[in-house]
């Protein structure tokens, strides 16, 4: 497995600030979904193993996704969930319009951000400190049912936001999760190749929303972007959001959550099924 340089999550961004937090769920406490979505039920009755990678550049995380996805297709590993924060980067999907990136190359260098073209669906989005990015590497029972998979991701985000007192939902005709139908809380962009998913979701937790001034988020001009911190009026502990989102995704997929310690992934090719 590739060696990737990591920094502890939370070393950048507002999540280190003092905050009023919801009750921390017990490790053995079952997750109860707040949304009305039924589990995706991936069909193999396996576990969802969580890997917290900390803060990492986009490129190495993308390479790691591809490597793990190939191992998953070969049944050498079970389903994985990568949780990361990225250094500032704007990414654009296969069908995206590069005119939605407003910053020039010189401006990107000035603000210290990358621009990367990727193989997911969707348009342009931002990743950076204070944002929780989740990359499920899972085998779908029905690879053609991409819409249901995306709705499962949306349900998990809605449930997670509810756990912190933020009421969020879907907006007809648009992907992602929204607050009051006007403010985008989370973006989704995925790829399914030979039945296994890559890419995933980006949930604004304590994100500095000024980064979004350099782009037209997802190509949508008439909506705002928000974060849990903005909606609540205070910063939120990233670790708690990671725990709730992991449980929500496992519930949405119909899998058993099996977290592993923070840090580098385990040995490549190790069996987890």
Which residue ranges define each predicted feature?
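N-terminal lobe of the biotin/lipoate ligase/transferase fold
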Residues: 1-185, 210, 235-236, 266-273
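A structural signal for short, well-ordered beta-strand segments
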Residues: 134-136, 175, 188-190, 201-205, ...
């Amino acid at each position: 497995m590739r060696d990737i340089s990591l920094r502890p999550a939370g070393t950048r961004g507002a999540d280190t600030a003092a905050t009023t937090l919801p009750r921390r769920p017990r490790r053995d406490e079952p997750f109860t979904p707040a949304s009305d979505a039924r589990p995706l039920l991936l069909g193999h009755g396996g576990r969802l193993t969580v890997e917290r990678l900390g803060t990492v550049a986009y490129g190495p995380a993308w390479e790691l996704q591809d490597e793990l996805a190939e191992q998953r297709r070969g049944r050498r590993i079970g389903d994985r969930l990568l949780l990361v924060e990225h250094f500032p980067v704007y990414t654009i999907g296969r069908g995206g319009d590069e005119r939605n990136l407003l910053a020039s190359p010189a401006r990107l260098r000035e603000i210290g951000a990358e621009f990367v073209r990727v193989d997911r669906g969707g348009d342009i989005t931002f990743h950076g400190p204070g944002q929780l990015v989740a990359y499920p590497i899972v085998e779908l029972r029905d690879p053609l049912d991409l819409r249901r998979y995306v709705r499962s991701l949306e349900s998990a985000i809605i449930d997670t936001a509810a756990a912190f007192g933020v009421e969020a939902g879907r907006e007809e005709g648009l992907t992602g999760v929204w607050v009051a139908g006007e403010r985008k809380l989370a973006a989704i962009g995925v790829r399914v190749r030979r039945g296994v998913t890559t890419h995933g979701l980006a949930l604004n937790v304590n994100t500095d929303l000024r980064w979004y001034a350099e782009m037209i988020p997802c190509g949508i001009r008439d909506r705002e972007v928000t974060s849990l911190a903005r909606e609540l009026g205070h910063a939120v502990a990233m670790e708690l959001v990671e725990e709730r989102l992991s449980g929500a995704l496992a519930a949405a997929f119909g899998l058993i959550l099996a977290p592993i310690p923070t840090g580098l992934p385990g040995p490549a090719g190790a069996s987890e099924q």
